[in-house]
């Protein structure tokens, strides 16, 4: 996230305090104002490595910044943020049932950043996002990097920041292996191995 030099470049002022209510009224009655605007005003699909055939990351620049990723309350200064998504992650997770009861929650392990390629890709993506915002033309609007801040600069520090702040994006999905082996979940007739009568 970055602090900006002028409030006209950020949604923060319009999304705080009493202003957010006037923006809500504008939207309800005229379909205008803050709530009619996209969350991400700039989106780019980029390659983190030149030798790749197609882009492997999506970057979004967002014209607001928040004090807490959990509460999502706009900062009291003009700000912007950036987010990145790895388009084809290599890490794989797992889901396991914990009991015969359909009411018991399954055990889900996402295993985010379990693969070296994923870690390198996201570290490179953070560097690309920073380079774009730190470019000379951005001097007109950018003040300074608010978070994680310039103190986070090595690959190890960036990876730790990613681990502490990353969230899932879009829709988590997956599949399971079919076959007779011990790594397969279902057989060729979609019957779940080890559980009689479950398809």
Indicate residue ranges for each PLM-predicted region:
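Mid-to-C-terminal "cap/lid" subdomains and adjacent gly/pro-rich loops that border
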Residues: 1-76, 133-136, 153-156, 160, ...
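C-terminal structured subdomain/cap of oxidoreductase catalytic cores
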Residues: 1-9, 46-49, 79-138, 159-199
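A general boundary/transition motif marking the beginning of the first structured unit of a protein
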Residues: 13, 32, 85, 117, ...
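Short, glycine/acidic-rich hinge or "gate" loops at secondary-structure transitions
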Residues: 139-151
